[in-house]
Amino acid sequence: MAITEVSSLRALKEVDGNFDFSSMSALTAFNGFPNLTTVGGNFTLSGLAVSELKGFDALTSIGGSMSLSNLNEVTSIDAFPVLKSIGSQCSLIGLKKLQDISLLAQFKGMHLNNCILNNLDALTSLDLTGLEVDALQITGKNALTLKGSKTLNTNLTINGIPGISFSGIEEVQNVSVSNMPATITGRVEYNFPGLKKIGTLSVSQAYGASLGVLRFPDLTEISGKLTLSEGFGQKVQPTEFPVLRIVNNMTYTGVCDALRFPALEEVTGELNIKTSYVNGSLVSMLQEIYTPVLKKVGILVLTTYSKNQDSWCNNVLTNLDCFRALENVGVINIEYQLGLVSFKGLEKAIGGLTDDTSWVVGHNAYNPTFEQAKNGELERN
């Protein structure tokens, strides 16, 4: 017999283990636990036909994780007015009509290891003010506005969201962006405005071709590492950083035609650019590097994704004029650039090198020794 109501459990005060109500499509009302104060294990509500989520007015503590999923008729969550403690993570998944997560406001002062917000299709904004969470994962298909205080100390994972506006939030500890929607009908921008500083940033684009463009229009500094994995097969567009000035370390791998950083002045540590990429029969080569104001790099590395075959190495780049502004570099490592015949663009940077250990050059169309480079023999005759 299908369960249609839970009023017989009104006297329940504590659950030592897990509290799990799942796949009960006949249960249309869920307000029968007014005296429940503690769940020792995991708390799970999933696959219920309820339109309102109420009835946990006394619940203060969940020892394990909290999971609310596939509650397709629920538009708001007001069921936990005194909840103060969750042992591990909170997951809200597949709540297609949920328009407001006032539940997060109740978590102020509570520490969460992880918060997962997946496929909340009706949600357009999210207030993170006061939320203390080590990792926040957001997956969906609609653009969002994230509100909060200036600094968000969390590892933020953004999966498939076509742009997020940061309102009040200027700094985030770590950000990972992946699986942006693909479009082939024309340029579409996926903007992430408001962010000015990030600890580490990882961008991963997908295998399929796309004219969609990820943009960080206000980002000026990445204090840790920038990892760009710009596609794994067919052509995608390079992520745009119009005002990014300082990066600690940067790695680029991908299938873009160009890598552009119009305002970048310094890469404190290593700048590692793999100028070609191979996946099966698909071979992609960078055709342009644009760094007109880059003056300082700790270690400059231009190499290839795979050294197994010459046909997999870049044969398009013929010079390094993109680095004409570069004045200060600790190590120059240029290898497997089969079209490269001129190092003239590194003339200023070479002037500051002091010994041959800072000059690693080989398997290019032209391979000047350290002595030749210091003597100005920077182009193949």
Language-model regions, residue ranges each:
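Concave beta-strand-loop units of leucine-rich repeat
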Residues: M1-T4, S8, D16-T28, G32, ...
